[in-house]
Structure formats: structure tokens, C-alpha cells
From Swiss-Prot:
<dbReference type="InterPro" id="IPR005797">
    <property type="entry name" value="Cyt_b/b6_N"/>
</dbReference>
<dbReference type="InterPro" id="IPR016174">
    <property type="entry name" value="Di-haem_cyt_TM"/>
</dbReference>
<feature type="transmembrane region" description="Helical">
    <location>
        <begin position="347"/>
        <end position="367"/>
    </location>
</feature>
<protein>
    <recommendedName>
        <fullName>Cytochrome b</fullName>
    </recommendedName>
</protein>
<dbReference type="Pfam" id="PF00032">
    <property type="entry name" value="Cytochrom_B_C"/>
</dbReference>
<feature type="binding site" description="axial binding residue">
    <location>
        <position position="83"/>
    </location>
    <ligand>
        <name>heme b b562</name>
    </ligand>
</feature>
<feature type="binding site" description="axial binding residue">
    <location>
        <position position="182"/>
    </location>
    <ligand>
        <name>heme b b562</name>
    </ligand>
</feature>
<keyword id="KW-0830">Ubiquinone</keyword>
<dbReference type="InterPro" id="IPR048259">
    <property type="entry name" value="Cytochrome_b_N_euk/bac"/>
</dbReference>
<dbReference type="GO" id="GO:0006122">
    <property type="term" value="P:mitochondrial electron transport, ubiquinol to cytochrome c"/>
</dbReference>
<comment type="function">
    <text>Component of the ubiquinol-cytochrome c reductase complex (complex III or cytochrome b-c1 complex) that is part of the mitochondrial respiratory chain. The b-c1 complex mediates electron transfer from ubiquinol to cytochrome c. Contributes to the generation of a proton gradient across the mitochondrial membrane that is then used for ATP synthesis.</text>
</comment>
<keyword id="KW-0408">Iron</keyword>
<keyword id="KW-0812">Transmembrane</keyword>
<dbReference type="InterPro" id="IPR027387">
    <property type="entry name" value="Cytb/b6-like_sf"/>
</dbReference>
<keyword id="KW-0479">Metal-binding</keyword>
<feature type="transmembrane region" description="Helical">
    <location>
        <begin position="33"/>
        <end position="53"/>
    </location>
</feature>
<keyword id="KW-0249">Electron transport</keyword>
Length: 379
């Protein structure tokens, strides 16, 4: 007789996704990051829910309410620091997850990949509106600068900006709607993650060799459930270490000052996880050009499956592509560094060169390397 986990309408779905799911035997630790992202999302939703109970989305009270959470609410300081640093770990896992997909050719599962890119954009939007909520100096000026970029759109730009602001400047209406969006988006992300998983389970997981593994699969539980558990322990230990020993390491000191529309901070910059995109934005002197470059720096991921020219899926046996991949990683680090620097020589030219290399790697060098490797195979 079949067990309840296989016959029950609801439990059978969970069984198919997390228990009896056939998984390739040889998937490495790089395949842990999907579940780690799920853990990050749950952590952020739970801590965010408790923070929202004590937060006040009003410009005269927002900063004070965050201070009140940290001082007066039981374990409020802990919740706030877990939530703030959890965002950083979320993005670390996200970038590693995307890097894994690029290296091993997982992007050839087009539906899964494109839903993943949409998820990436949603997470970025959520993090942006969330950063505005404490209403510190960098919150206010970050919101002003980034929302102002929409004015670069021809004809509708200015109207669009005022529509998003809910007035003629970043004000109370802006804070209220950003709080609404920040509360809503994580649940949208959770829903989109389900679609991401649905598409993934249509094809099954890729593996480090990039070969068909249907002949050699094992059940997800107990093998990979325990492997994921190890990842959970390491991630949570890292989060606790960061939160309890150095909670403000990744934050901007400017955000400890309440928002003041009359005083502009000397260097306006986003959180570290947006610096690479910010560097690409700043590398183009034209406003509209910069905004488009910013947009395409993320959307370019969607064309990766189209520009894949190699006969092999994974980069495991493709030395040229491996060199390009690690060049991209180095380039991302350079862009992240440049994004945090002032706009002056030599940082301007370094940022421009790094931005050109970033796009060239995706559009020119990767397809070219695949083609050359195909030729090398035929020799």
C-alpha cells in the first residue's frame, strides 16, 4: 500500500519536490545555493515580519522607530541586525548561484534561467526599497538619486518620477509606498521561486559534467537533504558571526544620521551588493545611456542561452571559457570597488574599461570562445 506522502494531493507535491526527487549523484556543493537562498528568504520574511510590527512608516518617526526597535524591543537589535546582514548573505548566495549557472551551463534550461533573472530583479527591487525605510541620510539620498534616474526616459520621465514619489520630492508618500512594496515583494519572490522550482523539476538538475544524468540518479532525501542541512548550518553560523561580532561592517556610517534634504552626503553610494551595477551606470556620461547600461547589465543574463555556441554544455572541459569566466569574476570585483570610489581620475577610466569588458565578455568573447573550442574539438 502506498504511503500518505505519495497519495495525499498536497503532501505528494512536497514529496516530489523534496523527498523522492531524482537528483544527479555528482552535483557538488555549488548546487547548495538554491536551498540556501530559500533559507535566506524565509529568514528575511520572518525577521521582517517582526520588524514591521514595530516600525512606523512616517518620515518624522521612521528613524526613531528603528532606534526604538534596537533599544527597547526584546531582541530588537538582534532582529534588525539579522535582517540587515541577512540581505548581504542573500546577495552573496545569489551571486554564487548565478555564477554556478554560468559556469556549468545551467542557463540552457531557458525557462528556469529566465524566471531566475526575473527573481534577481525582484530581489534587487526589494533590497532597494528596504534600504530607504530606516530614513537615514543614505536612505534618503539613495532613494532620491536612483528614482531620479527614471527622469531619463524621454517624454514620460518627469511625470514617472513624480508618480513614484507621490509628490515633488522624496517625502512621506514615498516612504509609505516603499514600505508597502518592501512588505509585498518577498511574497511575490516566494511565489516566483515556486515557478522557478516547477520549471527546474520539469527537466531535472544539471550536473558538473553537463551531461545527461538520467541513468544515474539518487533520491533527494536523505542524501541531498542532509547535504543542504550542512550548508544551512554554515550559512546560519556565518550570519550569527557577522551579526553578533560586526553588525555594522557592511553598512554605511552615513545612515546613522537622520535624513536631511538640506545636506547632501559627500559620496552617495548604494549597499555593496549594488556597487557593480552603480559603477556601470556611472561609467556612461549620458543619463539615459547610463540607465540603459544599468538595465542591460542585468538583462544581459537573459541572452546568455542564445549566445551559447559550444557543443559542450559545462565549462568543465573548456579552458578558454574558464579563463573568460574567471575574468568576469575579477571584472565584477573591480566594478564593485569602483562603484564605491569617488568620481575622479583614475577611477572614471577604470570603471569605463571594466564596463566595456563586462559587456564584451557576454556579447563577444564567450560566443567566440565557444566557436574556437568547437574548432579545436574537430582538429
Amino acid at each position: 500500500m502506498a504511503t500518505i506522502r505519495k497519495t495525499h494531493p498536497l503532501i505528494s507535491i512536497i514529496n516530489g519536490a523534496f523527498i523522492d526527487l531524482p537528483a544527479p549523484v555528482n552535483i557538488s556543493v555549488w548546487w547548495n545555493f538554491g536551498s540556501l537562498l530559500g533559507l535566506c528568504l524565509i529568514t528575511q520574511i520572518v525577521t521582517g515580519l517582526f520588524l514591521a510590527m514595530h516600525f512606523t512608516s512616517d518620515i518624522s518617526l521612521a528613524f526613531s522607530s528603528v532606534a526604538h526597535i534596537c533599544r527597547d524591543v526584546n531582541y530588537g537589535w538582534f532582529l534588525r541586525n539579522i535582517h540587515a546582514n541577512g540581505a548581504s548573505l542573500f546577495f552573496i548566495c545569489l551571486y554564487l548561484h548565478i555564477a554556478r549557472g554560468l559556469y556549468y551551463g545551467s542557463y540552457l534550461y531557458k525557462e528556469t534561467w529566465n524566471v531566475g533573472v526575473v527573481l534577481f530583479l525582484l530581489v534587487m527591487m526589494t533590497a532597494f526599497v528596504g534600504y530607504v525605510l530606516p530614513w537615514g541620510q543614505m536612505s534618503f539620498w539613495g532613494a532620491t538619486v536612483i528614482t531620479n534616474l527614471l527622469s531619463a526616459f524621454p517624454y514620460i520621465g518627469d511625470t514617472l518620477v513624480q508618480w513614484i514619489w507621490g509628490g515633488f520630492s522624496v517625502d512621506n508618500a514615498t516612504l509609505t509606498r516603499f514600505f508597502t512594496f518592501h512588505f509585498l515583494f518577498p511574497f511575490v519572490i516566494a511565489g516566483a521561486s515556486m515557478i522557478h522550482l516547477l520549471f527546474l523539476h520539469e527537466t531535472g538538475s544539471n550536473n558538473p559534467l553537463g551531461l545527461n544524468s538520467n541513468v544515474d540518479k539518487i533520491t533527494f532525501h536523505p542524501y541531498f537533504s542532509y547535504k543542504d542541512l550542512l550548508g544551512f548550518i554554515i550559512l546560519l553560523a556565518g550570519l550569527m558571526f557577522l551579526t553578533l561580532f560586526s553588525p555594522n561592517l557592511l553598512g554605511d556610517p552615513e545612515n546613522f544620521t537622520p535624513a536631511n534634504p538640506l545636506v547632501t552626503p559627500p559620496h552617495i553610494k548604494p549597499e555593496w551588493y549594488f556597487l557593480f551595477a552603480y559603477a556601470i551606470l556611472r561609467s556612461i556620461p549620458n543619463k539615459l545611456g547610463g540607465v540603459l547600461a544599468l538595465l542591460f547589465s542585468i538583462l544581459i543574463l537573459m541572452i546568455v542561452p542564445i549566445t551559447h555556441t559550444s557543443k559542450q554544455r559545462s565549462s568543465t572541459f573548456r579552458p578558454l571559457t574558464q579563463i573568460l569566466f574567471w575574468t568576469l569574476v575579477a571584472d565584477m570585483f573591480i566594478l564593485t570597488w569602483i562603484g564605491g570610489q569617488p568620481v575622479e581620475h583614475p577611477f572614471i577610466i577604470i570603471g569605463q574599461i571594466a564596463s566595456i569588458i563586462y559587456f564584451a565578455l557576454f556579447l563577444v568573447f564567450a560566443p567566440l570562445a565557444g566557436w574556437v573550442e568547437n574548432k579545436m574539438l574537430s582538429w
